[in-house]
Amino acid sequence: MEAVLPSRCNREDVPGKARAERFVSGFPSVCEQKTEQEKLSGVVKRVHLDLRKKYRKAGDFEKIWLEHCKDDGRLCEYAVAMKALADNHWAKKCEGEGRIEWCLGVCQEYFFNGGKKKALEKDAKRDALNKLQSSSHAEAGVSDFGVPSIKPLNDEYMTGKIRLLDVGSCYNPFLKYEDFLAVGIDIVPAVETVFKCDFLNLQIQRPLQLAPDAIDAFLKQLSSPIDYLPTELFHVIVFSLLLSYFPSPYQRWICCKKAHELLTLNGLLLIITPDSSHQNRHAVMMKSWKIAIESLGFRRMTYSKFSHMHLMAFRKTSLKTTSDLLTRNYPDMLYIPQDFNYDGEEDHFSPCCARSELEDEQLACGFTELPDTPYDSDSGESHNSTMPFYEFEDPILLLT
């Protein structure tokens, strides 16, 4: 970087002819870069809009999704556009892949710096308190309950590599990190290191009764396409800008349910979803997501809101995937603002229509914002400021 800065600072000293030669020799102008980015972004946006329009018109998300997965030409165009945006525009614009670094930071703190131990100790204290409260209703003669001692905590720290599944991976950005045994999947991979897999229709099988080394060997011999995986296989599953891709809340629900089945006990589900609104604009929506995802057997461990996205980490707290769909319609609680847009609000888009600056930044910086400090959902403090994060109660969401 030091070799580049002087040339940038002395830019005006370079004769006009020399500057022109630099652009001709492979350095596109700002205008050319913007035009290319608008074209690539248009490809991505049209796919999202068309999926939502088809879902609103037909209502059969399974049929629409199967047809979408068969459209190889359009999916390949989408994958190429996403890869080009990530490589040539987003990373350069914001000088790094913040979403990846955030995931790395969460995993480092949880698996290697004592975060998992603290969470397990907190669970033990919570269980002890619940037992004490329940014992208060027992007969007076039963008085030897006491405060249960916290059991020794095994499996507090990672001893091997973190087995990570990146869903909708595109180009498997976690593969280069030695701490991870990363498996990237996508419906149409952009690179050979990502396996072809339709996560919505992935078949879940019984868990592998194998030693950790043997499980690692199993993952290393995977090949495309992946049609099935055993339960309790991964320590971390990443949904980065994934859930908003789907037009139906129920599809997002299926993804979270499958993630719970594929995670080991106390494994992490990391969810990153775009949102350029201010701090509390969609607080009710995030409260809704929290309730829905925790109903599956998760507990939210970390939350952060930055200018262009929400970042959440959920910990699997029960082996059994549980959810009472009779009491609440949990799938519909995984909504996004686009679910309520009318078709007329989106028909203005055309291939020759430039994206707004806000839309550019939402996608660009969705990959790049970094957290400042950890956030515990019990503390009520957000990452990016000292301002408390208030999860507003919505009577509609809290009805039983």
From Swiss-Prot:
**Example GO biological process term?**
negative regulation of TORC1 signaling
A GO molecular-function annotation: S-adenosyl-L-methionine binding
Give the top-rank taxon of the lineage listed in the UniProt record for this protein: Eukaryota
Protein EC: 2.1.1.-
User: Where do the annotations place S-adenosyl-L-methionine binding?
Assistant: 99, 168, 186, 198-199, 240
What keywords sit in the KW lines? Methyltransferase, S-adenosyl-L-methionine, Transferase
Tell me the enzyme class: transferase
Q: Write one Pfam family the protein is assigned to.
A: Bmt2
Q: What does this protein do?
A: S-adenosyl-L-methionine-binding protein that acts as an inhibitor of mTORC1 signaling via interaction with the GATOR1 and KICSTOR complexes. Acts as a sensor of S-adenosyl-L-methionine to signal methionine sufficiency to mTORC1: in presence of methionine, binds S-adenosyl-L-methionine, leading to disrupt interaction with the GATOR1 and KICSTOR complexes and promote mTORC1 signaling. Upon methionine starvation, S-adenosyl-L-methionine levels are reduced, thereby promoting the association with GATOR1 and KICSTOR, leading to inhibit mTORC1 signaling.
**The protein's assembly and partners:** Interacts with the GATOR1 complex; interaction is disrupted when samtor binds S-adenosyl-L-methionine. Interacts with the KICSTOR complex; interaction is disrupted when samtor binds S-adenosyl-L-methionine.
Recorded family membership: Belongs to the BMT2/SAMTOR family.
PANTHER family hit by this protein = S-ADENOSYLMETHIONINE SENSOR UPSTREAM OF MTORC1 (PTHR21008:SF0), S-ADENOSYLMETHIONINE SENSOR UPSTREAM OF MTORC1-RELATED (PTHR21008)
**Could you identify this protein by its name?**
S-adenosylmethionine sensor upstream of mTORC1
Q: Which organism is it from?
A: Xenopus laevis (African clawed frog)
